[in-house]
């Protein structure tokens, strides 16, 4: 089971990637209102046919070896660090998919240890999802 704190750190860290239409919402939650615009984790994208797709948007790690000044996950940033294994990401993705929360995964990462090492972990995650978990989602 993935601890809630690591999950929150890595979904909140992913909100800075603005490639999903619902990333970085500035709307505030109102008491008694429905929905949650402030929390990261689920983003929405659109398929070629115009259909809206819900995606789990998460970082594999926010623990970066580089110190790029523009990046909130840079090495010297004063943020809590977290990393998920490929297996943990797969279990999380499949669990959310089975509960009908998402249709796919939007996975990104800080450069953890080295660029090559990070890319191998990302590829391993995709391979596990498709082969071991037989995930056909987006």
Give residue ranges: language-model regions:
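Conserved, mostly hydrophobic/aromatic
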Residues: 55, 68, 107
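Short loop/turn motifs at secondary-structure junctions
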Residues: 6, 67, 101-103
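Conserved glycine-rich "GG(E/T)P / GGGxP" loop and the immediately following alpha-helix
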Residues: 105-124, 128
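Short Fe-S-cluster ligation motifs
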Residues: 94-108
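Short, charged beta->alpha transition segments
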Residues: 57-58, 87-98
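Short beta-strand/loop segments at the ligand-binding rim of alpha/beta enzyme cores
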Residues: 131-138
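Flexible, acidic/Gly-rich N-terminal and inter-domain linker regions that tether
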Residues: 1-63
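Canonical Radical SAM [4Fe-4S] cluster-binding loop centered on the CxxxCxxC motif
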Residues: 58-87
């Amino acid at each position: 089971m993935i601890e809630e704190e690591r999950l929150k750190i890595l979904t909140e860290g992913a909100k800075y990637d603005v490639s999903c239409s619902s990333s970085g919402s500035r709307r505030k939650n109102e008491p008694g209102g429905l929905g949650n615009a402030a929390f990261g984790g689920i983003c929405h994208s659109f398929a070629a046919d115009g259909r809206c797709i819900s995606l789990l948007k998460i970082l594999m790690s926010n623990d970066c070896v580089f110190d790029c000044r523009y990046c909130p996950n840079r090495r010297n940033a004063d943020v809590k660090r977290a990393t998920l294994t490929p297996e943990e990401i797969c279990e999380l993705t499949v669990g959310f998919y089975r509960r009908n929360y998402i249709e796919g995964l939007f996975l990104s990462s800080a450069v953890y240890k080295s660029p090559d090492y990070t890319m191998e972990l990302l590829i391993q995650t995709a391979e596990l999802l498709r082969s071991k978990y037989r995930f056909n989602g987006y």
